[in-house]
């Protein structure tokens, strides 16, 4: 294909994959983003006029992981040049065994420190409650500083309405003296769109509002400024762990246990810089920029492109 490469080079044409695949037509996405920005601005204005302060934001979102995350992404491995086969040193079934990471982001960057970071929850796929009780006891024994970490199980490894309500109950502080109203964001995921979730948020002092369908990849801070870096760090740590275990075993297939994956995720998430970057995302996505337009310059990436249209 040398002639083809020379032809492409002469006309300055490159063969590339799209770096973003939207889930809805661009016109629909534009409309949903506009609705999101208008409604959040109106909610902020309402709270400011009635209570005299600008409400802060929180956002939860789940992201899928696997028992062997690097293998699930089909990352390359080392082999000798000219070798006809590539050795398999991982449990292939573990690359398909899914679990969910449910993260929480906070718009107040100044409050994030070594002693105060947004918590998270891991949901593994398991029937019954025996595995859940075992993993919860494991987490309770650990001395986790600066954040709340919980673990649950479910038949599908994905969140249902009841799971979301339980997560909110464990991770959102109750309403009381000194609390202020906050805006709580969810993506357009059916179990989170129920009246029960709305009522629970209201009782805890949160105005719950959802991103438009297909718009979370543009304006949800968990997607734009947290999960990508979390996944990269997790894969690095998990790969190093599997290599150490492979050397220790001297051969055979290696697989990270649920407990080891919990430990790795705690190591990743116990970095205030990771959460502060996610906090900056509220400005980058236009969620809580100044209402007078003085911070519009901070809106960037896809959100900035749509904001300027």
Question: Where in this protein do the model-derived segments appear?
Answer:
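Phosphate-facing sequence motifs and polybasic nucleic-acid/acidic-lipid-binding regions
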Residues: 1-308
């Amino acid at each position: 294909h040398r002639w083809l490469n020379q032809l492409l080079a002469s006309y300055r044409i490159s063969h590339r994959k799209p770096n973003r695949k939207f889930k809805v037509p661009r016109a629909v996405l534009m409309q949903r983003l506009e609705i999101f920005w208008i409604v959040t601005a109106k909610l902020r204005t309402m709270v400011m006029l009635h209570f005299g302060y600008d409400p802060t934001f929180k956002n939860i979102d789940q992201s899928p992981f696997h028992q062997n995350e690097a293998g699930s992404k089909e990352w390359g491995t080392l082999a000798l040049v000219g070798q006809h086969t590539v050795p398999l040193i991982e449990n292939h079934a573990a690359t398909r065994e899914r679990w969910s990471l449910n993260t929480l982001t906070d718009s107040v960057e100044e409050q994030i420190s070594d002693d105060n970071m947004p918590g998270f929850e891991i949901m593994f796929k398991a029937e019954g409650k025996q595995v859940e009780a075992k993993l919860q006891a494991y987490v309770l024994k650990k001395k986790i500083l600066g954040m709340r970490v919980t673990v649950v199980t479910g038949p599908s490894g994905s969140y249902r309405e009841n799971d979301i309500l339980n997560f909110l109950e464990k991770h959102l502080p109750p309403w009381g003296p000194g609390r202020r109203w906050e805006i709580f964001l969810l993506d357009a995921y059916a179990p989170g769109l129920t009246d029960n979730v709305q009522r629970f948020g209201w009782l805890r002092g949160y105005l719950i509002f959802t991103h438009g369908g297909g718009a979370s990849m543009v304006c949800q801070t968990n997607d734009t400024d947290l999960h990508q870096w979390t996944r990269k760090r997790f894969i690095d740590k998990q790969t190093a762990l599997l290599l150490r275990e492979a050397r220790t075993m001297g051969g055979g297939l290696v697989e990270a246990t649920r407990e080891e994956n919990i430990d790795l995720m705690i190591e990743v998430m116990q970095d205030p810089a990771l959460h502060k970057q996610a906090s900056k995302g509220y400005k980058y996505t236009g969620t809580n920029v100044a209402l007078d337009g003085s911070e519009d310059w901070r809106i960037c990436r896809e959100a900035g492109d749509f904001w300027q249209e």
